[in-house]
Design a protein with these regions (language model features):
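N-terminal intrinsically disordered/low-complexity leader segments
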Residues: 1-7, 18
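Secondary-structure edge/capping motif, primarily at the C-terminal ends of alpha-helices
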Residues: 70-77, 104-112, 142, 164, ...
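Amphipathic alpha-helical packing segments from all-alpha helical-bundle domains
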Residues: 67-68, 103, 113-144, 151-155
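Hydrophobic alpha-helical segments that form the core
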Residues: 91-92, 132-137, 145-170, 175-189
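Hydrophobic/aromatic residues within well-ordered alpha-helical segments
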Residues: 58, 62, 66, 90, ...
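Helix-turn-helix
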Residues: 11, 15, 19-53, 57
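Hydrophobic alpha-helical connector segments
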Residues: 57, 71-99, 154
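Short hydrophobic clusters on alpha-helical segments that form packing/core surfaces
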Residues: 12-20, 62, 66, 90, ...
């Protein structure tokens, strides 16, 4: 009978995400991740093929949580008003998962995926592709006569909230008082 696992894959990825948010992915070593997780270094190596593979999982995990919420709200949007609400997924995500927000919004994707296994890179590419497809579909549905509808959706739902929260990250969490400002700017971008 094998020994009981010291840590789950999800808990290890979360610990690695916290280290990456605090120190940056370049300084996230297996030793610092093991300390954050409260497990021996050997337990980390037992759970992952390599540091590179673990960092890829950190980005993918954050992108999945964010992307699932973003796409669910975007697919449910039936008006520009409800589409504008999708922009609030970004600041709310950074408030509920500060480490995930820092991973996605304060670092480059390639900082986590460079040298990653092909399978992880393919999963990350699918997540990005799904987000782009969601924006395209929303533009066709909500701005059907606007030749620049796709651009407007991208600026309004990605660019504006990203710029607003990036002012605070990684050191601080964007305050809730920022949400009405993001919403107003998003509506302006969608309607002009």
């Amino acid at each position: 009978m094998g020994r009981r696992a010291h840590i789950s894959d999800a808990d290890l990825t979360a610990a690695a995400g916290r280290v990456c948010a605090r120190l940056g992915p370049g300084r996230a070593t297996i030793d610092t991740i093991a300390r954050e997780a409260g497990v021996p270094v050997g337990s980390v190596y037992h759970r992952t093929d390599s540091r590179t593979a673990l960092l890829a999982e950190v980005w993918i995990a954050a992108a999945q949580v964010f992307g699932n919420e973003f796409l669910m709200k975007l697919q449910d949007a039936r008006s520009l008003d409800t589409a504008a609400e999708v922009a609030l997924v970004t600041p709310r995500f950074t408030r509920t998962d500060h480490a995930g927000g820092v991973v996605l919004l304060a670092h480059r994707r390639d900082d986590f995926l460079e040298g990653a296994p092909d399978e992880a890179r393919a999963r990350a590419a699918r997540l990005s592709s799904d987000l782009q497809k969601g924006l395209t579909d929303a533009a066709r549905r909500l701005l059907p006569d606007d030749k620049r509808g796709r651009e407007k959706m991208a600026v309004a739902l990605i660019g504006i909230p990203y710029g607003a929260v990036r002012v605070f990250l990684p050191q601080a969490t964007p305050p809730a008082e920022l949400d009405p400002v993001i919403l107003a700017a998003t509506m302006a971008a969608l309607t002009h």
